[in-house]
Each structure stands twice: as structure tokens, then as C-alpha cells.
Amino acid sequence: MDTPRVLLWAIFLISFLWDLPGFQQASISSSSSSSTELDSTKDVGNRKEGKMQRTPQESAEGRTPPEHGLRQKDLRRRPPGQHQGQEPPGRGLRVVPHEYMLSIYKTYSIAEKLGINASFFQSSKSANTITSFVDRGLDDLSHTPLRRQKYLFDVSTLSDKEELVGAELRLYRQAPPTPWGLPARPLHLQLFPCLSPLLLDARTLDPQGPTQAGWEVFDVWQGLRPQPWKQLCLELRAAWGELDAGDTGARARGPQQPPPLDLRSLGFGRRVRPPQERALLVVFTRSQRKNLFTEMHEQLGSAEAAGAEGSWPAPSGSPDAGSWLPSPGRRRRRTAFASRHGKRHGKKSRLRCSRKPLHVNFKELGWDDWIIAPLEYEAYHCEGVCDFPLRSHLEPTNHAIIQTLMNSMDPGSTPPSCCVPTKLTPISILYIDAGNNVVYKQYEDMVVESCGCR
């Protein structure tokens, strides 16, 4: 058979078989199996070379924009309990100082400048720290008369190293919407620890008296005596008193049923209250003299553990200390502050020992995150030489006089005495602690009043 005829028969056979459905499916399956075998061969080769094929989902993740990857990384670095977008303690507008705490700060700050409150803080029974805690209790949404109301405070930030001097609960009584009217019997308000029969304090209200709004203050010092301090729950109760035995007019009218008691109608309801009218627990403590920087490091370390990121000092032993480095902006502020106030050499250093200006700006130090007031103050510093003969106003010690004399005879053998503060005074600071509580504290030795040679 010649070649043209063979080719013609082959074309005819192929066209005939192509019209059969089974031949098309067999061809597709054969192609798929070939592709699978090819892919398998490639996978084996990739595994040998340390490469793996990525699924479509993995490929999509690999194409994630850099910003998304950065957010995921930051989320992994965020401490437990801090959600994305949550502000660290002491930042933003979440903590609003209560007017009572602001008034305390203003009063004592003015008194410090006038020098009239020294005896208050030097007394053995007085406080140098005042901490405020805002009520965290929930509203009672029931429609029944509210005869008892609980107030809950988180006092875990109080240190057992501090001496408890006093504590008070401040409740703002709103003006009742309507007068009570008869009967003319007293109304008793009593404060107890929750689940305890211990009466902490009591007040008597006159329902027929003036219905002016104002603060009711209860002494709760006994309720805070048990330690350790974690949570403090206080319960306010109301009860009608007995008629006065001398009120003959009321008795002549006969027995009258008093209206049902409801703390809401008395002005003690929680609903529709601005922040400045919420219940406030004020604790007065006396702490031992403590180094400011040590105490602030503890405060910042606690705040960092509660959720601050990227701007607070790393806690000791932190496994990821690198992620808690100060922000570049804060480093620039500190560098600028150091360069502006760190030059103490040259001609001025040859002046005699005296007090020089030193303006402290807490914002430049990066402390404005948690310090409310003051944001700046004049600390002063001592600078100059202590050469022979020493002036009497420098109040030198006998040792400083001898040391200065030896230095004048042989400067190489004995260094000169140093120009240091001889009298320091305190300042008041209002700040936010690690629990987002507003704290007033008087810090000793913050302002140089006089300098001398020592």
C-alpha cells in the first residue's frame, strides 16, 4: 500500500474515532493524568531543593500589604489584656480629675508657696498622699423601691507599706424632684461594709428640710483597716426613724404611714449623673520618704503591665525588652533637654557657690502622660566653687572648712568641698497611678531653697 493511501486511511480513522464520546473523555483523562504526573514530579523536585508549592490561600496571605503585616506584628507585641486601639493608662481623655482632687491640689499648692502648711504634713498622724477611687458599681435597674445601694471600689493599687490615716466616702445627693411632706419623722442613712453588720457611719436627714443638692461625707476608715486591699464594697441603707417624743402636734394627728423609702427619690440614684457627681472614695495615707525616681519607675512599670506599649520603661526581667524602648520622639525630647540644661562648664563654674535657676518641664521629660499638675516648676540647683575662705552664709560644716583649707594649701592632694543644697522644700503633684486613679502627693526635697559647701 502506497504512502498517500495510508495517510488517507489514518485521517479517516481519526475523524471517525473523534466522533465517539468515549474517546474524548479518555483523551481528557490522559491529559489530566499527564499534568498530575508533571506536577508531582515538580513537587518532588521542589522538596528536594527545599521549596514547597503554596496553596491559593497561602499565596493570598503572601500578598498581604506591608501595613497589614505590621499590624499583626504589633498585635503580637501588645501585652495581654490590651486591645487594639486601647490607650495606655494615663493617656488620652479617659481619666478626668475630680473637682475635689483639683481643689485639694490647688489648696495645698498655694499653702506651700505661702509656707503655712508645714505643720500639717509634719504631723505624725497626717497624710502626705491622697488617692481617689471612682465608684465602679452597676445601676439597679429594678422598679422596686431602692432601700439599699452598693458602691464598689478597686483599691488594689494601695500599698501595704503605706500607713492608713483616714478614708471617706463622698456621695453627691441630688435635689429630690418633689418634697416629701408629712410625716415629720427623721430619715436615717447608714453605711455598712457589704455582708457585714459593722456600722461605719450614719447621717440623719430631715425630709421637710431644704432640698438642696450637696455632698454627704461618710467616714469609712474602719472598713479599710483589713489588709490586703483588693476590693472595697460599701452599702448605703435608709430607714425611717421614730417620731420625736416632744412633737405633740404630730402625735395628736395620730399614726400615719410613712411613704416607702427609695434612695432614688432621695437623690442617691446613679442614673443620669455626670462624672463629677459620681460616688468617690478618698483614702488618706502616709508613706515613708521614698526616692522619686524609684517610685515613678514602679508606677510606670505597673502601667506598662496594664497595657502601655512603646513608651514606658521595660519591667525587670522582661523577655521582650526591645519592644518597650522609648519612642524616637521622646528620645529627641530628652536629648534636647539634656543638651539645653547639661552644660555647666566654662566661666560660670568659677563663680562662688550659689543657687541658680533650673526650670523643670515634665512634658520635656516625657512625664506628661501621667502627671496632671504641675506640668512645670522651678527647682533651682546649686553651682559654683567652694574656695577659701568660705563665706558664713554658705553654712559650711567643720569638715568642709578643713577640707577647703587643705585644698587651698595643696590642691593636688585634697579635692575642694562641694556646692550642694542645704535646704529643700516639697511640692505637690497630682498624677494618675497605674490603676487610673487620681492621686495627690506631696514630694519632699523638690525645690532648692539655699546652697552651701559640704
From Swiss-Prot:
GO terms for molecular function: cytokine activity; growth factor activity; identical protein binding; receptor ligand activity. Residues 28-93, 247-268, 303-350 are annotated as: Disordered. The lineage of its organism: Eukaryota, Metazoa, Chordata, Craniata, Vertebrata. Induction: Strongly up-regulated in tibialis anterior muscles after denervation. Its main location: secreted. The keyword Nucleus does not apply. Belongs to the TGF-beta family. Disulfide bonds join C353-C419, C382-C451, C386-C453. SUPFAM superfamilies: Cystine-knot cytokines. Keywords: Apoptosis, Cleavage on pair of basic residues, Cytokine, Developmental protein, Disulfide bond, Glycoprotein, Growth factor, Secreted, Signal. It comes from Mus musculus. Residues 329-350 have a biased composition (Basic residues). The gene is Gdf6. One of its GO terms (biological process) is metanephric tubule development. Residues 23-334 form a propeptide. Residues 1-22 form the signal peptide. InterPro entries: Cystine-knot_cytokine, TGF-b_C, TGF-b_propeptide, TGF-beta-rel, TGFb_CS. It holds the Pfam family TGF_beta. The keyword Signal applies. Glycans are attached at N117. Expressed in different subsets of developing joints. Highly expressed in the cochlea. This is Growth/differentiation factor 6. Residues 39-52, 60-73 have a biased composition (Basic and acidic residues). Homodimer; disulfide-linked. It is found in: Secreted. SMART domains: TGFB. Residues 81-92, 303-319 have a biased composition (Low complexity). Growth factor that controls proliferation and cellular differentiation in the retina and bone formation. Plays a key role in regulating apoptosis during retinal development. Establishes dorsal-ventral positional information in the retina and controls the formation of the retinotectal map. Required for normal formation of bones and joints in the limbs, skull, digits and axial skeleton. Plays a key role in establishing boundaries between skeletal elements during development. Regulation of GDF6 expression seems to be a mechanism for evolving species-specific changes in skeletal structures. Disruption phenotype: Mice lacking GDF6 display photoreceptor degeneration. Animals exhibit abnormal electroretinograms with up to 66% decreases in the bipolar cell-driven b-wave and 54% decreases in the photoreceptor-mediated a-wave amplitudes, as well as 3 to 27% reduced photopic flicker fusion. The lengths, but not the widths, of dermal flat bones in the skull and the digits are significantly shorter than in wild type. GDF6-knockout mice also shows cochlear aplasia, while the vestibular anatomy is normal.
